């Protein structure tokens, strides 16, 4: 018996309204997501071999506490390799398109929707893994900083940037990256020592010589910075990306200009729900620190 495979060049969207993207389509999306996601740029990738949960191994330093699964933390008294359970959770996004899309081949529809899918996923991954916003994960970079009491409250200036780094140095952590946002650059340029030398190099986008990556997210407030050892941030992706097309119902998370929810049938639109499983985990408990302008953002 011949197994029928999904050929996106020949199958119309109306003929296949749910299923999984082909491996090639998933690879294309994940390549673009990885190039834009801060978690994926700075974190350490682990192959999950198609498993929802996978044991990976982490080298400890004999001083710090380490998360070995989502709820259990251990502390070792000497450097050793410990098993860590990396568990994937589902992240979903919803996008809308004209009902005309039902007449497209899946290949054309995929090419049209790919930029939106990529942007939505890398934003979702970063907000969950870095900020802990609407996250299925047990920990995040920001939560790690808060739980370790490694938060500096105050404006971006030379003194506070040094205090931020000192939080990590006191824990014997060498930061290898900062996460900032473009709106912070003017404050960073004005962060100068007594000799009027700036700690920020705009030509290389580095703070105190350390790589700085800008996060584009409304959830990451102006004046906030994250820093730490991003080798302690690990992630994995076990499966292909899944999709489901809907033609009826309301999209409560999306609004028309008048504030009413989008009604797919009445407005002749379709919605595509795209889901992926991804694991994101902070392994070293005190690996990160945060600078925030407001105590409300701690």
Tell me the role of every PLM-derived stretch.
Residues 1-27, 36-38, 45, 261-298:
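Protruding loop/beta-arch "assembly-hinge" segments enriched in small, turn-prone residues
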Residues 59-60, 97-99, 182, 274-276:
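Residues immediately flanking
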Residues 92-171, 290-291, 297-298:
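Alpha-helical scaffold segments that mediate packing/assembly in large oligomeric complexes
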Residues 63-65, 184-189, 279-282:
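Flexible loop/turn segments at secondary-structure boundaries
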């Amino acid at each position: 018996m011949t197994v029928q495979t999904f050929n996106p060049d020949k199958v119309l969207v109306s003929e296949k309204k749910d299923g999984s993207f082909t491996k090639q389509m998933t690879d294309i999306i994940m390549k673009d997501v990885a190039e834009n996601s801060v978690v994926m740029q700075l974190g350490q990738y682990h192959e999950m071999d198609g498993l929802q949960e996978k044991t990976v191994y982490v080298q400890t330093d004999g001083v710090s506490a380490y998360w070995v699964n989502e709820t259990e933390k251990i502390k070792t008294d000497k450097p050793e390799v410990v098993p860590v359970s990396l568990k994937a959770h589902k992240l979903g996004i919803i996008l809308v398109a004209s009902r005309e899309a039902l007449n497209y081949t899946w290949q054309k529809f995929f090419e049209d929707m790919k930029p939106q899918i990529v942007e939505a996923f890398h934003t979702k991954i970063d907000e969950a893994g870095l900020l802990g916003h609407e996250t299925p994960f047990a920990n995040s970079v920001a939560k790690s900083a808060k739980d370790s009491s490694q938060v500096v409250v105050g404006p971006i200036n030379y003194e506070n940037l040094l205090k931020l780094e000192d939080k990590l140095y006191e824990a014997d952590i060498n930061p290898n990256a900062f996460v900032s946002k473009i709106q912070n650059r003017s404050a960073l340029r004005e962060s100068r020592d007594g000799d009027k030398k700036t700690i920020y190099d705009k030509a290389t986008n580095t703070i105190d010589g350390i790589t700085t990556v800008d996060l584009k997210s409304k959830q990451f407030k102006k004046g906030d910075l994250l820093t730490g050892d991003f080798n302690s941030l690990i992630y994995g992706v076990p499966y292909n990306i899944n999709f489901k097309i809907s033609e009826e119902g309301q999209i409560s998370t999306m609004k028309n200009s008048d504030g009413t929810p989008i009604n797919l049938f009445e407005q002749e639109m379709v919605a595509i729900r795209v889901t992926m499983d991804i694991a994101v985990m902070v392994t070293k408990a005190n690996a990160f620190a945060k600078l925030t302008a407001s105590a409300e953002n701690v």
